[in-house]
Regions:
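Solvent-exposed, non-transmembrane regions of membrane-associated and secreted proteins
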Residues: 1-208
Length: 208
């Protein structure tokens, strides 16, 4: 797998097709370097405050974080229902959620295969609420992104695992979501973290 960023360990990719999100996944959600490169696994929880456990795609609670660039398209910006509007997540000081993405796919991919999750809802938490990353018995994905304009809060997008595929037995439609010669990646904004995209809008690389 093409490493792309020196000093970071690429885990694979995340795709949310309904929101045109395709990002590389690295191993450091707690540094500017990691977040400026794309998505990263987030693994510091109440149970594991120093992040000793390395998460595994398709197992337990796989946490992911990326920037919300408040533009509806870069990083995880597309997961906020209305750009630059706290509603429906924060209303009159009350933390709410949203079901606008329920049922949509979250796809993770690494050298072993594709992990097919379905969104079950969104909730809002403060930026200190690391319990959302606590280990779970069931396989799920927990995506963390900032709320705009109230950036002290985090939108949590929850997904449950539905299927695991090897590259050989995965449906062609799912495989195509990670075809970097045809699909654009959306990790970089010129005004914040300029860089070369890995997809058809940049290096046009493959998954090798």
């Amino acid at each position: 797998m093409h490493q792309a960023v020196k000093g970071l360990d690429k885990q694979g990719f995340v795709s949310i097709p309904s929101r045109n999100i395709l990002l590389p996944v690295y191993n450091d959600a707690y540094s500017d370097k990691g977040l400026n490169a794309g998505a990263n696994y987030a693994n510091k929880s109440v149970i594991d405050p120093t992040g000793e456990h390395k998460p595994i795609m398709g197992e337990g609670n796989y946490g992911l974080a990326a920037h919300n660039f408040n533009d509806g398209q870069t990083g995880f910006s597309g997961l906020q229902q209305y750009t630059n509007h706290d509603s429906p997540y924060l209303q009159d000081g009350h933390l709410k959620g949203s079901d606008w993405l329920n049922g949509q796919k979250i796809l993770l991919a690494n050298a072993h295969g594709i992990y097919d999750y379905r969104i079950t809802g969104q909730t809002l938490v403060t930026n200190k609420k690391i319990s959302v990353l606590n280990p779970t018995q069931t396989a799920q994905v927990t995506i963390i992104s900032c709320l705009f304009p109230s950036t002290d809060y985090r939108i949590i997008t929850h997904g449950k695992l539905k299927n695991i595929y090897t590259w050989d037995n995965a449906p062609r439609k799912l495989v195509n979501e990670f075809n970097l010669k045809e699909k654009n990646t959306n990790a970089h904004a010129s005004w914040w973290n300029p860089g070369v995209e890995e997809g058809a809008n940049g290096q046009k690389g493959g998954t090798e």
